[in-house]
């Protein structure tokens, strides 16, 4: 599955559809496929299978670390080149979580973290100006209320206007009067909160918790190490994707396109 998705990523990078400055979709006529979304799951499956087979060896051997890193870096490089910084970060997080769950020594994560901190200024220098601006606007949306901070401000207004029980299905003003252009993806939770209010949002969170609990429980009761590792990794990934989507981090273009509501519905 990983190899297939990797080939789709290469195809998208070479012959894919370009929209909003990014070449990341494949036209299947009846739908546009974004392979980078599939890679979030493919990397979990691949790592779970790899460490299932590596049980007879030490997971902390050099080869047991370097091979997964190579497997992880290849799709990240392709996704960044599209460009899609946010999805590449989410793919990296998916892989890193499985590495941690597989029992990789904490020292590798510490060293990697130090390298990341040291190289951060160098990495930031490669960000597009609009990406830097949106990160700054996420930290302080009021600095540009009619520009890069617009959606975050409108998102807060929408959530607040939903009140306790919301305005009702398809009756949200911020969403359907186009104050939130990305309401169907980046700000889907905002739209939901406006229509169903605080109570509806809490119910949605409970549903998410139940789904994640069931996934983890299936893994805990599984006799297969592959199934156990996949379920734990998948549950952790969904939790991270939901957190990012709900915290509106996605608008900094650390995008979480369809990472919560859509991904869970499509896969489960």
Label every PLM stretch briefly.
Residues 94, 111, 155, 163, ...:
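Ubiquitous "structural anchor" signal
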Residues 263-268:
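Hydrophobic alpha-helical segments, chiefly the membrane-spanning helices
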Residues 115, 261-262:
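Intrinsically disordered, low-complexity Ser/Thr/Pro-rich tracts
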Residues 1-151, 190-247:
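Hydrophobic alpha-helical transmembrane segments of multi-pass inner membrane proteins, especially
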Residues 137, 141-185, 196-200:
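TM-adjacent membrane-interface loops and short helices in multi-pass inner/ER membrane proteins
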Residues 252-259:
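Conserved small/polar residues in nucleotide/adenosyl-binding loops
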């Amino acid at each position: 599955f990983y190899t297939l998705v990797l080939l789709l990523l290469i195809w998208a990078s070479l012959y894919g559809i370009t929209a909003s400055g990014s070449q990341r979709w494949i036209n299947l006529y009846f739908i546009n496929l974004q392979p980078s979304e599939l890679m979030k799951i493919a990397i979990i499956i691949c790592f779970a299978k790899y460490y299932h087979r590596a049980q007879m060896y030490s997971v902390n051997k050099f080869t047991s670390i370097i091979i997964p890193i190579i497997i992880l870096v290849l799709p990240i490089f392709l996704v960044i080149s599209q460009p899609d910084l946010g999805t590449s970060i989410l793919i990296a997080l998916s892989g890193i979580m499985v590495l941690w769950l597989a029992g990789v020594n904490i020292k590798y994560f510490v060293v990697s973290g130090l390298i990341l901190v040291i190289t951060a200024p160098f990495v930031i220098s490669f960000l597009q100006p609009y990406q830097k601006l949106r990160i700054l606007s996420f930290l302080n949306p009021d600095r540009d209320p009619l520009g890069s901070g617009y959606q975050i401000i409108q998102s807060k207004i929408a959530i607040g206007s939903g009140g306790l029980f919301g305005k009702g299905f398809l009756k949200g003003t911020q969403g359907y009067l186009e104050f939130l252009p990305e309401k169907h993806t980046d700000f889907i939770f905002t739209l939901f909160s406006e229509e169903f209010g605080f109570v509806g949002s809490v119910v949605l969170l409970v549903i998410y918790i139940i789904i994640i609990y069931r996934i983890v429980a299936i893994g805990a009761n599984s006799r297969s190490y592959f199934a156990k590792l996949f379920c734990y990794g998948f549950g952790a990934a969904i939790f991270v994707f939901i957190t990012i989507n709900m915290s509106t981090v996605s608008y900094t273009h650390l995008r979480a396109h369809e990472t919560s509501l859509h991904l869970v519905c499509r896969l489960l």
